[in-house]
């Protein structure tokens, strides 16, 4: 797990100069298009060879990054805590120094010599670890308190998402991958978080879900969350390509598709997304999972029924999974099982889904941690996430490996393993301080006291702290100088 991912950097992370942009315009021509040979899975389009030597890449999940945090502010020193090394799984006493939005150094616990204006966090007896990452959220989804006539509203969804993102931040999450929401609300939240306009984790947004007519997330069209503001129904390869492009235009960091679809449709969607530099994840089951893995999907969501052959193909092609075990345990245990969205001839059960997880674990499939926070589930963090980690342990993971999955593994699946997921000099400063030892007791993850996201100390002693607004100086003409 120590090696960096082999897949190329997403276009969403490339900061281009005007010259580089001009050079990249030609990529749409046939001579540059990386269309796969017939029958072979499409590969991600790596634009890095076209950049000028030494060109910087962005640090946020937006194609045109916002101005980075200034690097001339006071240092933030997290002193003498138990540092959880998410790469090795070891813990050791250390002091972490943050400058601007990056980790400046990881030093011995008794290191000294800070500037007089340095901010000091005394982490003695506490665990210092990378910020948590949730790989499957729906922060703009309505909950039971949402009025029915507001559930399809982009404005209401944006406000609801801002509230839910605060809950995630307070719980120690510094990144979430949001896999379906109302209209453009997830894109707005992603942009606002990246710009520092709202206190929130980084948001890697899919925007909406793409499916065939009558497919998943459209089963109950009378409900707003199963309507066109949340799910886009398309038919035919060209329509699937077009919807991928629309999501890209809106600001997607990832593409989410769902069954049902035809083989040529799923292949077209994956090919188009990969040409744009985006990865694709799929919510699917049975034969649709086989179609997706054969077409070159990057990831499969949920522990839904799939054949042993599909699992073997996932392992061979290094296709990852995000099993979302806890939410399915709740859903299936309460109902005793339910029918798949594309067939009423079989039911899914909690034990059957857990068996799928264990098969994937045995096959060596890399699995990320996500909660599938639909409805009131956003109100249940961090308990829902801790429960998810416990299911990982029940399925064969050690506590250490579960925490690695929650941090560095998730970061690598986001194509951000070089910037997030571990506390190392030079990486972005996404750090939490936990009053306990989560590597020994996962329940201690509920005791997050400090959260630093992008170098900003946002949660202090468990409370959200936002800087006071500083008025911008007036432009000329100035007000009357002789008036007091």
Annotated model-derived regions:
Residues 58-75, 83, 88-129:
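Histidine-rich, glycine-flanked metal-binding segment
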Residues 213, 257-354, 373-376, 396-398, ...:
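Active-site core of metal-dependent hydrolases
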Residues 81, 428-469:
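C-terminal cap of metal-dependent C-N hydrolases
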Residues 143-146, 186, 290-296, 325-340, ...:
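Histidine/acidic-residue-rich catalytic or RNA/ligand-binding cores of hydrolases
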Residues 126-192, 213-217, 221-223, 292-295:
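Metal-associated gating/positioning segment near the N- to mid-region
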Residues 160-186, 200-207, 250-259, 279, ...:
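Divalent metal-dependent hydrolysis catalytic cores, especially in the metallo-beta-lactamase
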């Amino acid at each position: 797990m120590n090696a960096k991912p082999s897949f190329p950097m997403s276009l969403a992370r490339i900061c281009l100069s005007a010259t580089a942009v001009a050079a990249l315009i030609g990529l749409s021509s046939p001579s540059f298009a990386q269309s796969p040979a017939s029958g072979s899975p499409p590969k991600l389009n790596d634009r890095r060879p076209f950049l000028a030597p030494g060109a910087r890449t962005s640090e946020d999940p937006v194609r045109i990054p916002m101005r980075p945090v200034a690097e001339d502010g006071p240092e933030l020193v997290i002193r003498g805590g138990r540092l959880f090394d998410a790469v090795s799984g070891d813990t050791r006493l250390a002091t972490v120094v943050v400058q601007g939005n990056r980790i400046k150094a990881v030093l011995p616990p008794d290191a000294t010599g800070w500037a007089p204006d340095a901010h000091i966090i005394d982490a003695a007896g506490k665990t210092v670890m990378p910020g948590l990452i949730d790989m499957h959220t729906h922060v703009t989804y309505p909950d039971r308190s949402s009025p029915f006539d507001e559930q399809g509203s982009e404005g209401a969804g944006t406000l609801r998402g801002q509230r839910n993102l605060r809950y995630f931040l307070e719980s120690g999450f510094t990144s979430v991958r949001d896999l379906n929401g109302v209209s453009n609300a997830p894109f707005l939240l992603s942009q606002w978080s990246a710009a520092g306009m709202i206190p929130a984790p980084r948001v890697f947004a899919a925007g909406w879900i793409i499916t065939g007519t009558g497919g998943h997330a459209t089963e109950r069209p009378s409900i707003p969350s199963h309507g066109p503001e949340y799910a886009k129904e398309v038919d035919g390869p060209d329509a699937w390509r077009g919807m991928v492009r629309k999501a890209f235009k809106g600001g997607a960091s990832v593409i989410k598709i769902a069954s049902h679809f035809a083989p040529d449709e799923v292949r077209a969607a994956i090919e188009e997304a990969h040409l744009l530099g985006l990865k694709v994840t799929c919510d699917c089951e049975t034969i649709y999972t086989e179609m997706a893995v054969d077409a070159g999907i990057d990831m499969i969501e949920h522990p839904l029924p799939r054949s042993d052959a599909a699992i073997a193909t996932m392992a061979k092609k290094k296709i990852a999974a995000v099993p979302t075990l806890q939410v399915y345990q709740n859903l299936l245990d309460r109902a005793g099982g339910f029918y798949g969205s594309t067939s009423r001839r079989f039911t899914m059960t909690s034990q059957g889904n857990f068996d799928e997880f264990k098969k994937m674990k045995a096959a060596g499939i890399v699995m990320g941690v996500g909660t599938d926070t639909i409805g009131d589930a956003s109100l249940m963090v961090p308990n829902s996430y801790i429960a998810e980690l416990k299911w990982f342990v029940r399925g064969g993971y050690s506590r250490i490996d579960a925490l690695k999955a929650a941090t560095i593994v998730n970061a690598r699946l986001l194509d951000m393993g070089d910037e997030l997921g571990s506390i190392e000099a030079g990486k972005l400063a996404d750090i939490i301080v936990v009053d306990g030892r989560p590597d020994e007791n996962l329940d201690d993850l509920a005791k997050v006291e400090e959260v630093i996201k992008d170098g900003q100390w946002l949660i202090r002693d468990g409370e959200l702290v936002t800087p006071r607004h500083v008025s911008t100086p007036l432009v000329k003409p100035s007000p009357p100088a002789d008036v007091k």
